[in-house]
């Protein structure tokens, strides 16, 4: 319908899209589906985490594109449909999709980076965009520490808002005194940014606290004592009581 001229969306990239949807061939076609009237959605391109029709349609399309997508049941809600939206297992769904923004898989924030306080880990960004974290040869802070290293200029992140992050995390105790900590978690290693709901309780408590109130475009250092990280029951490979050091790049919000 309209050709865009922005960044093209490739596998591993994140696309922020805005769409409306209607059911083909029924009275429902006179009005958009409930809760799908010009709603923003964040899609990890090629990730298989959204409707197949949208995933396929967005790939290789540039930001600024508006497209018409006709999705038969197999590419929309499948044989079971979606009762909440009023879509049956035999319904074809028509989408009008606007690609608002494309965030490359290895994007980072831009801006002058400040040095963290001497008592906190220091951060460098390598050529891949991943954070190189240098942990002091000292005991970790007992309380949550959040320090903004790069000032973003975008919207302020609100509780409940979906945001797109690059992240790198290390365990303080495992890396104490090391110039470059081993990362146990990294979106750059995963090959795609992470989408989270700020303050939604689905990530570390420290991240939830650190994200809300920051501006999009910020880089934030988070040092999380165990009570704000994994506590006494961490995942495999992380010691109980671990202090987690994370570097978060807030790339976008929807």
Language-model features, listed with the residues they occupy:
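Cross-family detector of peptidyl-prolyl cis-trans isomerase
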Residues: 1-254
């Amino acid at each position: 319908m309209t050709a865009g001229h922005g960044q093209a969306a490739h596998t591993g990239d994140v696309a922020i899209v805005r769409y409306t949807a209607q059911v083909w061939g029924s009275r429902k076609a006179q009005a958009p589906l409930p809760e799908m009237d010009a709603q923003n959605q964040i899609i990890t391109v090629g990730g298989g985490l959204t409707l197949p029709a949208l995933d396929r349609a967005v790939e290789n399309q540039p930001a600024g594109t508006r497209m018409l997508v006709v999705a038969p049941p197999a590419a929309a809600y499948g044989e079971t449909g979606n009762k909440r939206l009023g879509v049956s297992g035999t319904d074809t769904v028509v989408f009008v999709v606007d690609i608002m923004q494309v965030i490359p898989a290895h994007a980072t924030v831009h801006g002058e980076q400040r040095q963290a306080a001497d008592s906190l880990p220091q951060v460098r960004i390598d050529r891949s965009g991943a954070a190189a974290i240098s942990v002091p040869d000292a005991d970790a802070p007992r309380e949550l520490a959040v320090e903004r290293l790069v000032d973003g200029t975008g919207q302020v992140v609100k509780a409940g808002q979906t945001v797109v992050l690059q992240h790198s995390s290390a365990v303080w105790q495992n890396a104490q005194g090391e110039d470059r900590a081993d990362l146990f978690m990294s979106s750059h290693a995963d090959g795609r940014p992470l989408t989270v709901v700020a303050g939604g309780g689905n990530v570390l408590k420290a991240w939830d606290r650190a994200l809300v109130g920051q501006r999009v475009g910020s880089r934030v250092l988070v040092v999380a004592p165990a009570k704000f990280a994994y506590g006494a029951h961490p995942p495999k490979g992380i010691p109980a009581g671990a202090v987690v050091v994370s570097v978060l790049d807030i790339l976008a919000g929807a």
